Swiss-Prot record:
Coiled coil: none annotated. Interacts with the GAP domain of NF1. Interacts (via TPR repeats) with HSP90AA1 and HSPA8. Gene3D superfamilies: Tetratricopeptide repeat domain. TPR repeats lie at residues 116-149, 155-188, 189-222. It comes from the Eukaryota. Residues 36-49, 75-85, 99-125 have a biased composition (Basic and acidic residues). One of its GO terms (cellular component) is cytosol. Residues 20-125 are annotated as: Disordered. The modification Phosphoserine is found at S90. This is Tetratricopeptide repeat protein 1. Keywords: Phosphoprotein, Repeat, TPR repeat. Pfam families: TPR_1 (PF00515), TPR_8 (PF13181).
Amino acid sequence: MGEKSNCRVPEDLFTGLKVTDPQEAECLHPPVSSGKEQHSQSELLKDVDAQPQEDQGEEECFHDASASFETEEPGADKLENKPEDDMNPSELDEEYLMELEKNMPDEEKKRRREESSRLKEEGNEQFKKGDYIEAESSYTRALQTCPSCFQKDRSVLFSNRAAARMKQEKKEMAISDCSKAIQLNPSYIRAILRRAELYEKTDKLDEALEDYKSILEKDPSVHQAREACMRLPKQIEERNERLKEEMLGKLKDLGNLVLRPFGLSTENFQIKQDSSTGSYSINFVQNPNNNR
């Protein structure tokens, strides 16, 4: 064999192997200039859920939305046929997002915040028109755009996407969004109230009661929370009694199945509850019919 020549790797190969800038990787859409200013706070005071008014400020209400990527957007062609919760920046851990964005220039953060505000306003208008699918898509894209350092902005976006999902009966997804909103802003009463309502609708009464209590601790004037705190304890007690009866009924059926080969039934065993301790005792009765 001849002598080996010095091999040079083509520069084109290096070009093809360049690592994408983390800042570019997280941008799912091309930059869009922010030509619109944010709506005034007074224009957003109307919440379609008729939630009690709270401290609005940066946390002003968004309007309910629903999830879809059917609406075509520049650069979104790869997302259209995927579930919106699959690998979206809006679903990533906030601390992880913040780590990715730590070297992002302030000007870029400002631009992205303005763009997310534009998408938010777009979602608001879509929601008010009843276009919940399109509105949720706008909120999701706003979350993908909004830098994680603006936690209150992202909290509002999560809360309003939850409202949109409520409109489409996507209750579990809406609960998840509310929880993210509360994590980012623990004093965000609107998000807590929305999650409490969702817990009620999914028969998670204990969790709902805890949220309503949390609301009253932060703002005793919220009538809906006060009314729920008076109503839910009785509902929880009735539910627990119903579950206990169902459990005892199933145990009785199982007991009869096991005892039948021995000529016995659960009627041979009397269960008595101690009123002072609430505990139960079981007594064997040879001829239960004679004791009636």
